[in-house]
C-alpha cells in the first residue's frame, strides 16, 4: 500500500511506471471551459498574452474540480508563430495558423534569444508563477507542439505529407529544423520549472500518415526529444494511432496519451514499456453525457489498464464542472487493478464484451 501522495509525486510515478495510491486524474489537454473561465475571470485572447491570467486558468481545473495537473499555454500555434507564421486572432478561442511561412527549409530562422520571442515569455512566466504558487505540489505540464506538427504549420500540412512520398529529403529537412526548435523551447520550459512536458503532435495522426511514414519521418524526432529534453514527456497524438503504437513505444518517451484507440488495446501493445494516458471522449461524453456516464467511463479506462486518465483531446467549452468532478471522483474511488495481460482485462470487463472488442475492434484495426 502506497501512503497518500502529493499530486506531483503521484503523476510523476504514474508517468514513469511507478507505484501510486490511485490512478491520477491528471489531464494535460486544455480544459478552458466556459465555466472555469468565468470563475477565474479569464478571457480570450488576453489569456494567451498575460502570464498571471494564464497561470490562473491553468490552475482552475485543479482548484475547482481537483484535476491533478496545471497546463499553461492553451494553443499549439505559438511555436509556428515564433517561426514566422501568421495566426488568426479573430477566432473566439485558440488561434489557428493562417498558412505556411516557408517553401525552402534552408530559409527557416528564429530569434537568437528564444526567452524573449513571441509569446514564449508569457508561458515561461506562467510556469514560474505556478511553481511558486504550489511550491512543487501540483505538477506543471505545459504543452510543447511537436516536430511533425510544427513542420506542417510552417510548410503546410498537405505539402509536408505529400513530400514524405515525393520529396523525402525536403520533408526530413523541415522536420529536422522543427525538431531543433522544439527541443530548444522544451529545454527552456524545463529550466523555468516544468515538471513534465506534454509534446502534442496531432498532425502525426494515423488518420494522416501510415505506420511506416511515422517510423521514417516522425520517430527519429520523438527519439531526439526523449534523449535531449531532461524532464519526463507525455506524447499526445490524435486520431487512430493503432498502426503507430509499435513504433511509438520505441521512442523512449515515458507516456503516451491517445485518442481513438481502445485503452485495453493500447495497454496490450505498450505492455510495461510505456505508461498510457487515456481516454475520455470529448465530442459527446464530456460535454453531453451525465456525471454518472463520465464516472463509469473513467472506471472502464482504469480497469482496462490506463496509468493516468485524461481526455482524448482538448475539453470543449460546454463541458460542465459536474462532469469534470465525476471524472476526478472515479479516479479516486476506483481501486487499481492488477493484471498480468490483456486476457485478464477481458475477463474483468466481461468475457462477451471483451471477446467482441478483441475480435471486432482489433480485427478492424489490422485490416
From Swiss-Prot:
Q: Which reaction does it catalyse?
A: methanethiol + coenzyme M = methyl-coenzyme M + hydrogen sulfide + H(+)
Q: Which SUPFAM superfamilies match?
A: UROD/MetE-like
What is the E.C. number?
Answer: 2.1.1.251
Q: According to its UniProt record, which cofactors does this protein need?
A: Zn(2+)
| Signal peptide limits | none
UniProt-listed InterPro entries = Methanogen_methyltrans (IPR052024), Mtase_MtaA_CmuA (IPR006360), UROD/MetE-like_sf (IPR038071), Uroporphyrinogen_deCOase (IPR000257)
Give the residues the record marks as binding Zn(2+). 236, 238, 313
Where is the chain membrane-spanning? none
Explain how, and how many, cofactor molecules are bound: Binds 1 zinc ion per subunit.
One matching Pfam family is: URO-D
Keyword Transferase assigned to the entry: answer is yes
Q: Which GO terms describe its biological process?
A: methanogenesis; methylation; one-carbon metabolic process; porphyrin-containing compound biosynthetic process
CDD domains xrefs: Mta_CmuA_like (cd03307)
**Is Cytoplasm a UniProt keyword of this protein?**
no
Instruction: Could you list this entry's UniProt keywords, alphabetically sorted.
Output: Metal-binding, Methanogenesis, Methyltransferase, Transferase, Zinc
MF annotations from Gene Ontology: metal ion binding; methylthiol:coenzyme M methyltransferase activity; uroporphyrinogen decarboxylase activity
> Main role?
Methyltransferase involved in methanogenesis from methylated-thiols. Catalyzes two successive steps: mediates the transfer of a methyl group from the substrate to the cobalt cofactor of a methylated-thiol-specific corrinoid protein (MtsB), and the subsequent transfer of the methyl group from the corrinoid protein to coenzyme M.
Q: Which PANTHER family match?
A: METHYLCOBAMIDE:COM METHYLTRANSFERASE MTBA
Assembly and partners? Homodimer.
Q: Which family does it belong to?
A: Belongs to the uroporphyrinogen decarboxylase family.
Q: What is this protein called?
A: Methylated-thiol--coenzyme M methyltransferase
Name its species. Methanosarcina barkeri
Amino acid at each position: 500500500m502506497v501512503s497518500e501522495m502529493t499530486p506531483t509525486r503521484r503523476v510523476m510515478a504514474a508517468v514513469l511506471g511507478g507505484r501510486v495510491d490511485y490512478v491520477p486524474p491528471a489531464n494535460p489537454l486544455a480544459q478552458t471551459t466556459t465555466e472555469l473561465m468565468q470563475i477565474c475571470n479569464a478571457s480570450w485572447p488576453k489569456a494567451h498574452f498575460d502570464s498571471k491570467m494564464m497561470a490562473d486558468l491553468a490552475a482552475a481545473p485543479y482548484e475547482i474540480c481537483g484535476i491533478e495537473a496545471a497546463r499553461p499555454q492553451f494553443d499549439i500555434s505559438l511555436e509556428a508563430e515564433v517561426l514566422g507564421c501568421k495566426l488568426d486572432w479573430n477566432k473566439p478561442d485558440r488561434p489557428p495558423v493562417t498558412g505556411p511561412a516557408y517553401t525552402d527549409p534552408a530559409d527557416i530562422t528564429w530569434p537568437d534569444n528564444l526567452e524573449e520571442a513571441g509569446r514564449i515569455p508569457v508561458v515561461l512566466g506562467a510556469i514560474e508563477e505556478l511553481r511558486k504558487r504550489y511550491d512543487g505540489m501540483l505538477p506543471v505540464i505545459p504543452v510543447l507542439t511537436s516536430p511533425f506538427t510544427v513542420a506542417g504549420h510552417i510548410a503546410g500540412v498537405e505539402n509536408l505529407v505529400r513530400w514524405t512520398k515525393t520529396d523525402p529529403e525536403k520533408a526530413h529537412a523541415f522536420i529536422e529544423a522543427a525538431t531543433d526548435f522544439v527541443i530548444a523551447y522544451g529545454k527552456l520550459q524545463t529550466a523555468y520549472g516544468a515538471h513534465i512536458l506534454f509534446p502534442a503532435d496531432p498532425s502525426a495522426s494515423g488518420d494522416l500518415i501510415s505506420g511506416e511514414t511515422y517510423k521514417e519521418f516522425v520517430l527519429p524526432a520523438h527519439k531526439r526529444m526523449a534523449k535531449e529534453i531532461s524532464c519526463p514527456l507525455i506524447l499526445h497524438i490524435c486520431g487512430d494511432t493503432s498502426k503507430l503504437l509499435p513504433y511509438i513505444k520505441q521512442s523512449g518517451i515515458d507516456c503516451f496519451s491517445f485518442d481513438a484507440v481502445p485503452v485495453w488495446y493500447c495497454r496490450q501493445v505498450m505492455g510495461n514499456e510505456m505508461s498510457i494516458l487515456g481516454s475520455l471522449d470529448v465530442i459527446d461524453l464530456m460535454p453531453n453525457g451525465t456525471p454518472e456516464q463520465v464516472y463509469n467511463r473513467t472506471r472502464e479506462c482504469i480497469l482496462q489498464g490506463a496509468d493516468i486518465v485524461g481526455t482524448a483531446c482538448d475539453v470543449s467549452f460546454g463541458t460542465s464542472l459536474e462532469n469534470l468532478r465525476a471524472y476526478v471522483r472515479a479516479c479516486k474511488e476506483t481501486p487499481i487493478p492488477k493484471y498480468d495481460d490483456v486476457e485478464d482485462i477481458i475477463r474483468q470487463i466481461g468475457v462477451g464484451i471483451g471477446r467482441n472488442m478483441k475480435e471486432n475492434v482489433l480485427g478492424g484495426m489490422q485490416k
